[in-house]
Each structure stands twice: as C-alpha cells, then as structure tokens.
Amino acid sequence: MMMTAIGLMSGTSLDGVDVALIKTDGRHVAALGPSGYRPYTETERGLLRQALAEATGLDRRDARPGILAEAERAVTIAHAEAVAAFVAQNRITAGAIDIVGFHGQTVLHRPAAKLTVQIGDAQALAKAIRIPVMHDFRAADVAAGGQGAPFVPVYHRALAQSLGRDGPIVVVNIGGVSNVTYIDGNDALIACDTGPGNALLDDFVFRAIGKPFDCEGRLAAQGTADEGWIADALQHPFFAQRPPKSLDRNDFASLGLRDWSPADGAATLTAFTAGAIAAIVPLLPKPPTSFVITGGGARNLTMMRMLREQLEPARVESADALGWSADAMEAQAFGFLAARGLKGLPLSYPATTGVSFPMTGGLLARP
C-alpha cells in the first residue's frame, strides 16, 4: 500500500529543519512531493550548541539533564512549526499524511559505547501535528553493534531502482567527506566513505582567497593539478581498505599541502577528491555503469568534469539532472524510512553500518 509520508531532518550543521513529502510503500518511490525549510533562530542555534557540549557527559540515551531538556523542547517546537507551515503552504490536510519520519537532532553518537542520542519529543510532536510519528531510527542498529550510520543508502537504492536502468549504479554524495552507495539490483547494499569531499578544498580556498568554497569550480578550472602529489596522497592506507569504512572530516588534515598557487591548489584538491572516488571502483563487486552525484560537489562543474574523466566509460550525472533533489534528499529519506519501519523492513545492513544482520528500526508515537 502506498503511503504519503513527510520526512524531517535536522543535521549537524544546526541550520534548521528540512521537510519533504514522498509517496512510497517503503520499497518503491511512487512520487517526490514538495519540500520546505524552517531555519533555526540564532537563539535556537546557541541552545543546540550548548546541548551538544553538555551531551558529551551523557551515559544514558534517555537522560536530559540541564540544558538538554530545554533544547529538546525547542527542537520539538521547531519541527512542529516546520510541519504546520509546510502543510499550510502546500494546502495539505493533516489527514492526508499517513506518517511522519522524525530524525531529531543528534547530540551524541558513540557507537563503540552502543550510545546514540537524538533529542526531540516524538509524542509531543505527534500530538501537536495530529499525525503518527516514526522516530528513534538509529537506536536498534547501535544496540545490535552497528555504527548507526549511514541510513540513507536504502533510500538511494529505491531512487536508483526508479530509474529503470541496468546497474550497478553508484550514488555519490560529495559533502565535507565523500561517500558512496553501491546498488546492484539485489537486496544487498554496500555503502562507505571514499575520502575527502569538499572539506580539504573548501579549507584551502578559504585560506588562499578568503572565499568559503570554489563556486562552480571556477578557480580549479584555471589551474593545473599536481599529479605527483595526488599519486602520493592516494597511497594513504584508507584507499586500499575494503568497504564498509568511514572517516572524519579531519582524517586527511595531516597530508602536507604544497605551496601551490590558489588555482593550482584548487585544481589539485578537486582532482584528489575525484581520484579518491575512482579508487573505490576496483573494491566493488562489479564495475558500475553509472554514477549519480549529489551534495555540494554536484554543483562544482570542474569536479563533475574530472569525475567523468576518471570514471569513464560509466555515465556520470548530477542528482538534480535526474529530477532528484540534492537539498531535500535526507528529509525524503526519513519519510521513506518511516514507511519501511512501519512495515518492519530493514533500515540498515551489514555492508552499510556493519551490523551483523539486516535491521529494522524506529518507534511509533501516535497523536
């Protein structure tokens, strides 16, 4: 049975709440609906930053000492307001929505200690919006020994299947770190980080010319990549490791950057990101026939050109070119995961989070 679901996502950047509507049965995506955004106020951001600092001392996932209780109330209200504004703007009645997927705000994620904490009161949210709310998606995976992330690959698979193409297909998300989802048409999924995404490049560009990023890859387009440095950097042991594998934004900070001109440095680090993505291909079960690029890197035209060169003969295209929304993808994913959780379908797999068997997850709060 097809359901109309709303997904809600509040990410680590603490910018605000993304909202997206999706029609799905938890296996297939029938339609992608509108999306919206409710920014956090400066006061709310400050409160969340304090909550992140205070959460480092937590040893129980249900504890809300001090500022955490206040932050949880603020997160819940912000999400309720986001849903109310979204349904009003799009002239949707609450009764037309079957389920809301509520990720909450992660304040602590320590999978080695089997502890992941997302704040947000799902019961209060369900009452406020008068729609059932699926929440607490990561807890079961972490309790079973998984990493509790990534959870979006199962949604990537549904999107890829909707293309009706022969595979394998790889969805590449180029954020601060780059990660991939490998989809071969079977039920198994492989997901992992591939290396630096925009983080090294953005940091270099900021130091070199004071801009936060290389807009459309214009600076890199004027430079020449340092191929010797790239070859050395790709000798880092991470690139030979088989998936699943993950890293942090700062794991490559120790690579010694040379005294490049701004354009040559941007060209080198853009090519390094592309080369790191290409380095995963020999570690996959079969060579992919197409790559779909999402995240900020998809808007970098030089990055896209370099990826096409590195990944040929496979097809390389941006998510937006396929009618997917790079900006709404995570919110859509949690609408999709809510439908899956309702049906007891797996949300995570051994080759995505490292959990020992496919795991469902999520708890249901009724209004």
Curated annotation (Swiss-Prot):
<dbReference type="GO" id="GO:0005524">
    <property type="term" value="F:ATP binding"/>
</dbReference>
<dbReference type="GO" id="GO:0016301">
    <property type="term" value="F:kinase activity"/>
</dbReference>
<keyword id="KW-0808">Transferase</keyword>
<dbReference type="GO" id="GO:0009254">
    <property type="term" value="P:peptidoglycan turnover"/>
</dbReference>
<dbReference type="Pfam" id="PF03702">
    <property type="entry name" value="AnmK"/>
</dbReference>
<keyword id="KW-0547">Nucleotide-binding</keyword>
<comment type="similarity">
    <text>Belongs to the anhydro-N-acetylmuramic acid kinase family.</text>
</comment>
<comment type="pathway">
    <text>Amino-sugar metabolism; 1,6-anhydro-N-acetylmuramate degradation.</text>
</comment>
<feature type="binding site">
    <location>
        <begin position="11"/>
        <end position="18"/>
    </location>
    <ligand>
        <name>ATP</name>
    </ligand>
</feature>
<dbReference type="GO" id="GO:0097175">
    <property type="term" value="P:1,6-anhydro-N-acetyl-beta-muramic acid catabolic process"/>
</dbReference>
<comment type="function">
    <text>Catalyzes the specific phosphorylation of 1,6-anhydro-N-acetylmuramic acid (anhMurNAc) with the simultaneous cleavage of the 1,6-anhydro ring, generating MurNAc-6-P. Is required for the utilization of anhMurNAc either imported from the medium or derived from its own cell wall murein, and thus plays a role in cell wall recycling.</text>
</comment>
<comment type="pathway">
    <text>Cell wall biogenesis; peptidoglycan recycling.</text>
</comment>
<keyword id="KW-0067">ATP-binding</keyword>
<protein>
    <recommendedName>
        <fullName>Anhydro-N-acetylmuramic acid kinase</fullName>
        <ecNumber>2.7.1.170</ecNumber>
    </recommendedName>
</protein>
<dbReference type="GO" id="GO:0006040">
    <property type="term" value="P:amino sugar metabolic process"/>
</dbReference>
<dbReference type="InterPro" id="IPR005338">
    <property type="entry name" value="Anhydro_N_Ac-Mur_kinase"/>
</dbReference>
<keyword id="KW-0418">Kinase</keyword>
<dbReference type="GO" id="GO:0016773">
    <property type="term" value="F:phosphotransferase activity, alcohol group as acceptor"/>
</dbReference>
<keyword id="KW-0119">Carbohydrate metabolism</keyword>
<dbReference type="InterPro" id="IPR043129">
    <property type="entry name" value="ATPase_NBD"/>
</dbReference>
